[in-house]
UniProtKB/Swiss-Prot annotation:
InterPro entries with a match to the protein in the record: Enolase, Enolase-like_C_sf, Enolase-like_N, Enolase_C, Enolase_CS, Enolase_N
Coiled coil: none
Protein known as: Enolase
NCBIfam families found in the cross-reference section: eno
Gene: eno
GO process terms (BP): glycolytic process
Chief location: cytoplasm
Cofactor note: Binds a second Mg(2+) ion via substrate during catalysis.
GO molecular function: magnesium ion binding; phosphopyruvate hydratase activity
UniProt KW keywords: Cytoplasm, Glycolysis, Lyase, Magnesium, Metal-binding, Secreted
CDD domains: enolase
Binding site for Mg(2+): D245, E286, D313
Family recorded in the similarity comment: Belongs to the enolase family.
Length: 430
């Protein structure tokens, strides 16, 4: 029998480690009285929304200003004394104590990277202390839904040094019977795509998220993806569809969108996206308009909301206040969930809960600067989100999440349900 005292936080340590781009990030370890330990590493984004929680960096010359030694110090000298003695089982109380200690609106005092590292490590320590896998600890007995992966196989925008304006072109293998088969389908298309790019004399180097980064236009990227799906032996729109992350805030200036040689106002931008949906089997569009273009977003939702999943990333930044504003204005129909946008596990779960209660889907997501940490894989199953975005089929920091989902599916056995097989993947008319 587990003694509740064994689950009390005893020690918290932190260190500066590296992410997949070679930039420093924060790792925390939470040790409990009974000897259980949880470790977590926070990710970092390249295309960050203006409304995200504050990621604390040191500045100065060290690591070209990107060091996180200050965040590490905050954990060991401020957060640890506050949390030691609390039960790791009370995640809400642990996170609330850190938010109170920080005292700012955007976690700029302690740093969202410091708070999140401890928040995630606490959950893992509690799970380990109880002898439970993380997805079961966070999700309870109903945590059995494996997500449809949105696989970013062509990278552009802020994630790659190429001519593509849109940031991500993704495969969505919703027609698979299981997660394992979905992963196989996506992998086969990924390798087929590489062959097609090679045959056309295009680059097969990869971007931050493991996808290819050829010099293509947005329409050309869609065309070669459909070609790859077909050549791999699958039916576009029936077995594998497409998803886009437009990341339009990155090319929005003075009220206009400049991409592919054109310059568009909000209504014209919506028209451009409508044309793409008509041309390709697209089931999901993320950040189709800029983060503060609320009127444009409303128009986009009116025109395409009944056909495809419209995901707010920079628009909502995993923030319940921003999400509620979107719900009140009938804006978008889905939220991208990035734990480091809001900076604590409790607030992340609150955003997912609000989305679900309001008829919005949730897509659990990585960041472009990732690590070997697999928390988001467990989180996607724990919350029954039904969708995960964790990059392409290369680079071990991406594949780590897919491999963890394979383990979870095996562990669940006959209880495992693949979201695509029960119609719980992205919305769409494909």
């Amino acid at each position: 029998m587990i003694d509740s005292l064994d689950l009390v936080i005893d020690t918290i340590v932190a260190r500066e480690v590296l992410d997949s781009r070679g930039n420093p990030t924060v790792e925390a370890e939470v040790l409990l009285e009974g000897g259980a330990m949880g470790r977590a590493i926070v990710p970092s984004g390249a295309s960050t929304g203006a409304h995200e929680a504050h990621e604390l960096r040191d500045g100065g010359d060290r690591y070209m200003g990107k060091g996180v030694s200050q965040a590490v110090t905050h954990i060991e000298e401020r957060i640890a004394p506050t949390l030691c003695g609390l039960s790791a089982l009370d995640q809400a109380a642990v996170d609330a104590a850190m938010l109170e200690l920080d005292g700012s609106d955007n976690k700029s005092s302690l740093g969202a990277n410091a708070i999140l590292a401890v928040s995630m490590a606490t959950a893992r320590a509690a799970a380990n202390g109880l002898g439970l896998p993380l997805y079961r600890y966070l999700g309870g007995p109903m945590a059995n839904l494996l997500p449809v992966p949105l696989m970013n196989v062509i990278n552009g925008g802020a994630h790659a040094a190429n001519s593509l304006d849109f940031q991500e072109f993704m495969l969505v293998p919703h027609g698979a019977p299981s997660f394992r088969e979905a992963l196989r389908m996506g992998t086969e298309v990924f390798h087929t795509l590489k062959g097609l790019l090679k045959a056309k004399g295009m680059s097969t180097s990869v971007g931050d998220e493991g996808g290819f980064a050829p010099d293509l236009g947005n329409v050309e990227a869609g065309e070669i993806l459909v070609e790859a799906i077909t050549k791999a032996g699958y039916k576009p729109g029936e077995q594998i569809s497409l998803a886009l992350d437009v990341a339009s805030t990155e090319f929005f200036e003075n009220g206009r969108y400049a991409f592919d040689g054109g310059n568009y106002d909000s209504a014209e931008m919506v028209g451009q996206l409508e044309q793409l949906v008509e041309k390709f089997p697209i089931v999901s569009i993320e950040d189709g308009l800029a983060e503060d273009d609320w009127e444009g977003w409303k128009l986009l939702t009116e025109r395409l909301g009944g056909k495809v999943q419209l995901v707010g990333d920079d628009l909502f930044v995993t923030n319940t206040k921003r999400l509620q504003q979107g719900i009140d204005n009938s804006t978008a129909n889905s939220i991208l969930i990035k734990v480091n946008q809001i900076g604590s596990l409790t607030e992340t779960l609150q955003a997912i809960d609000l989305a679900g209660r309001s008829g919005y889907t949730s897509v659990i997501s990585h960041r472009s600067g990732e690590t070997e940490d697999t928390t988001i894989a467990d989180l996607s199953v724990a919350t029954r989100a039904g969708q995960i975005k964790t990059g392409s089929l290369s680079r071990s920091e991406r594949v780590a999440k897919y491999n963890q989902l394979l383990r979870i599916e095996d562990e669940l056995g006959s209880q495992a349900v693949y979201a695509g097989a029960v119609g719980q993947g992205p919305r769409g008319n494909a």
